[in-house]
Amino acid sequence: LESNDLLLNSSQKICAQTNDLTPPCPPVNFKISDQYSCDYYFFDKSCDEKDFENRIEWSSVDEECFLDTKFFNIYFSDNGYNNFDNIATTSNNYFVHKNLTNLKGAYFITALDRSGNESIPSDTIRRDNCPKYLLPNVFTPNGDGKNDFFTPFYTDGSITNFNYGNCPRFVRSVNISIVDRTGKQVFSHDSEEDTLNGIYINWDGKNSSGKELPSDTYYYIATVTFDVLNLDESVKEIKGWVQILR
């Protein structure tokens, strides 16, 4: 080497990233998927369905925030109001919450950037169960094995063209009193006491003494308790009539 040549030592050079402490934008347009609305979701679900799922969707605010976002944290509360748990982390803009015993609960999400900074929470959305309990207005207790009992709309899958949207859903208990035209009680049922028939009643058209009642119109008042978050919707009084045809 010539005496005036220089040697450059790069051994002390340090490569570093800027310490990013700025959290990303929170996700927006957070909602339950339209395909998971009560009517749509239960359109083809059997009356005995016990395995449920929710799908939630969202988007970022703008392109800059989207590029700064790497993951999303999903938080869930089964009581719908507090005690939220982080149940998943995903890079998608949707999440399917599977293996649920019911639909009710609440969700919020946060965004995570590449440095691990977490955004403020999104809006919280609540998902409630889809309560349903419908009673027919006629039954024929003649022992032919068809429509012999007064029971809510239900099928084990053997009825063709059955509307599964009418299945009893998320019912805790049923208490019903049935009277004749004079107002005399001819039958009563409490699902919490008669656990064999439960919410299905299965009235055979006989009075409380076991005597067959004549073909006629009878009137009922039923108090139905549902498994829902909304307490205003948890207890419903259903009044109606049913005709016995023999």
Regions found by a protein language model. Give the residues of each.
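Recognizes extended acidic, P/S/T-rich segments that occur
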Residues: D68-N102, D194-L196
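Short, solvent-exposed loop/edge segments of extracellular or virion-exposed proteins
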Residues: N29-Y41, V138-P141
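Beta-strand-rich modules
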Residues: L1-N9, V96-E118
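Extracellular Ig-like/FN3 beta-sandwich strand-entry sites
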Residues: T69, N102-A106, V171, S215-T217
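Conserved aromatic anchor
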Residues: F42-L67
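Beta-sandwich strand segments
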Residues: N4-S11, N117-S122, V228-E237
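Short loop/turn motifs at secondary-structure boundaries
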Residues: C25, C47, D51, R126-R246
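Proline-centered linker/hinge motifs at extracellular inter-domain junctions
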Residues: T22-V28
